Amino acid sequence: MSMRVGILTSGGDSPGLNAAIRGFGKAAVSTYGMELIGFRDGMRGLAENRFMQLDSHALSGILTTGGTILGTSRDKVHKMLVDGKVQNMIPVIKKNYEKNKLDALVCLGGGGTAKNAKRLSDAGMNVITLPKTIDNDLVGTDQTFGFATALEIATDAVDRLHSTAHSHHRIILTEIMGHRAGWLALGAGIAGGADVILLPEVPYNVESIAAAISRRSAHGSNFSVVAVAEGARNERDAAELAAADALVREADSPVARDAAKTHRANVEASHRAHTFTLATELEKATGLESRVTILGYVQRGGTPCGRDRVLATVLGTAGADLVAKGVFGVMVAAKGDGAEPVPLEEVAGKIRRVPVDHPWIRAAKEVGTGFGD
């Protein structure tokens, strides 16, 4: 009897999602004769049992398209808002899994999806994940699909900002996505020739940044471009966040943990305008006009680049191979040119940050890029 498999996309949208759906789906249907259904709008669609058939026709023509044909959401399976109340929907999801006679569930997503998938796996469902996020911050995989496209978009933005910064003798700060990891800002900063790159992993000192910019001015370069990761913080704010993180780790009960998480969210919210604050501080310190550009969601949109299409296809087809072999409870990780399974417990709840001695950081420093430290 052929296997019946469900697939969904969860968390933020990302270039390459449709390519991964296609890669898994075509291999599952054509190579292994599986029946494939796609749940709409992520975990919420799974809880509400909303799905569509994914046959060869539905999987055609989506390789190059952005977004996700299935829709997505950021719902947590154990804390989902339903009818005005936060409810644990894992029992409902398991009933739908059994009602649809699924042999496996494939979840495409990032860190939050890995945690959701681990909960479903622990509840007795056969689950695998494919690593999707422009942040490139998942543990256990060399790269996530979506990152390469976002890197191209962010690099193009940094390129373009050079000419306007030069023309008006300004400091231009461009805020780049990445959540609490600096991979995207670091890559775009290097590729775009940013003069300063600010990362979550390297708390910055405003005086150090101002001094680097002033040195450029003294040598005739009366402009600077600063690539700012959205999670970058000055030394004081970074210490405040670290203390809030410690409270979450040390919480000894669910109630204490929820309270600590709320405190951490409030601390993070108080830093929301950090790039604008930094621009004001640099303008005062250097005498140069400062402007801020927030790249925002443009980094997640549009058609995936060739590299992401290849990676999504490799991971998708490898996922179909694993399902056919009965390998579950894993993320399909990119390793070299191929893929291999990594247990979900090694991925869920963890963040792959940029090591401060990473070759990219060393290379950037050797070409004169500052990091504000």
Curated annotation (Swiss-Prot):
SS bond partners: none
This protein's GO CC annotations: 6-phosphofructokinase complex
Primary place of residence? cytoplasm
InterPro entries, alphabetically? ATP_PFK (IPR022953), ATP_PFK_prok-type (IPR012003), Phosphofructokinase_dom (IPR000023), Phosphofructokinase_III (IPR012829), PKF_sf (IPR035966)
Q: Which EC numbers does the record give?
A: 2.7.1.11
Specify the superkingdom.
Bacteria
Kindly list the positions annotated as binding ATP. Answer: G12, R74, D75, G110, G111, G112, T113
Looking at the keywords, is Transferase present?
Answer: yes
- Which positions are catalytic residues? D135 (proton acceptor)
Q: What are the protein's UniProt keywords? A: ATP-binding, Cytoplasm, Glycolysis, Kinase, Magnesium, Metal-binding, Nucleotide-binding, Transferase
Task: List required co-factors.
Answer: Mg(2+)
Output the Pfam families linked to this UniProt entry: PFK (PF00365)
Q: Where is this site: Important for substrate specificity?
A: G112
Q: Which GO terms describe its molecular function?
A: 6-phosphofructokinase activity; AMP binding; ATP binding; diphosphate-fructose-6-phosphate 1-phosphotransferase activity; fructose-6-phosphate binding; identical protein binding; metal ion binding; monosaccharide binding
Pathway listed for it is: Carbohydrate degradation; glycolysis; D-glyceraldehyde 3-phosphate and glycerone phosphate from D-glucose: step 3/4
| Annotated GO biological process | canonical glycolysis; fructose 1,6-bisphosphate metabolic process; fructose 6-phosphate metabolic process
Quick one: which residues bind substrate? T133, I134, D135, R170, M177, G178, H179, E230, R291, Y297, V298, Q299, R300
Q: Where in the cell is it found?
A: Cytoplasm
Q: What does this protein do?
A: Catalyzes the phosphorylation of D-fructose 6-phosphate to fructose 1,6-bisphosphate by ATP, the first committing step of glycolysis.
UniProt subunit comment: Homodimer or homotetramer.
Q: What is this protein called?
A: ATP-dependent 6-phosphofructokinase
